[in-house]
Amino acid sequence: MMNRAYSLRNSRAPTASQLLNPPPPSSSTRSGRLFAPLSHTMRINHAATFTPDLAKRLAVLVKMEKNVMRSMEVTIRGRRDCARQLSYWGEDCDDDISDVTDKLGVLFYEMAELENYLIDRYDQYRMTLKSIRNIESSVQPSREKKQKLLDQIYALKHKDPESPRLVTMEQELVREEAACLVAEAQLSNTTREKFKQAMTFNLDALHEHAEKLNLIATYGRHLLNLIDDTPVTPGEARPAYDGYETSRQIVMDAEHALSSWVPSQPAVNFVKPQIEDDAQSDARSWNEYEAQGEPVPVEQVTHLQDDVQSDTSEIIENEPGMHPHVHAERMSRIASESSDAVPQQTAVQVA
């Protein structure tokens, strides 16, 4: 939700994505302690020194991720301060600058709120990695005990091959090997399950954060269009600014787009698209024309440009959260690029 001073709402309502996927509890790493860089190094060194060998690498990764989250908290505080300062600076400027900086400050403050929510989602990923680390730590003693028994049996066979202790130790070794097999199987299964779960938390959080940042950037660009940057001569007065209602509506549209955003599952296709093969065959045929010094057929140039324009138009039409004015501007730019390509086609045909 936007900053309450500008949001037209008195209470924080859950967004559509939060209703679909309830937010996680607050991150366990939040604190206001000083000496952050020193504590970062101490955490990593402690994990590398006192953690069992099997879990050492993952333990260091978990501590590094905690350092990342602490750094994100610092970034959030700085972004909030910058958003307030931007609005404070524009207060004494002209009407258009004052209004736009005020509204951009709202959007930038919302970016800090999104990053604050990202920390909580990121902590889910880190805590799931910790569960893998705990399993690895529990398997390490079993491995060490098995290896210790093997060393003792080897030493005893060389010292006293007829010792009655060998039978007892070998029976104990069989039990330890069976326990190791169970522990290794559990480790393998848990690692795969928890790793996929952890990365799902991580990638889903990054996907939502990136999509919402894209929405904020889109509406922020539209706010900039309200500023008239036409040069004026000395003594000439600028037209009166009348974009207050428009800027207010843009912020409301951005708020609605952010609150109504829901995740969509991207389709992953591991089969090589046929269109790439067609493009490669077209490229080879163009190279053949160039090698033989012959002009490229106009039909082939037109076909390729039509495909590119069609794909670009489809991407723009399906892009979520795009403001209508921004959509019209991009479509007009595509149309102008297509019209500029006509003289190039004629030149190819004449050649």
UniProtKB/Swiss-Prot annotation:
Region (Disordered): 1-33, 318-351
Residue numbers of Phosphothreonine PTMs: 15, 230, 233
GO CC annotation: ascus membrane; eisosome; eisosome filament; plasma membrane
Record has Phosphoprotein as a keyword: yes
Alphabetized UniProt keyword annotations: Phosphoprotein
Domain of life: Eukaryota
GO molecular function: lipid binding
Name of this protein: Probable sphingolipid long chain base-responsive protein pil1
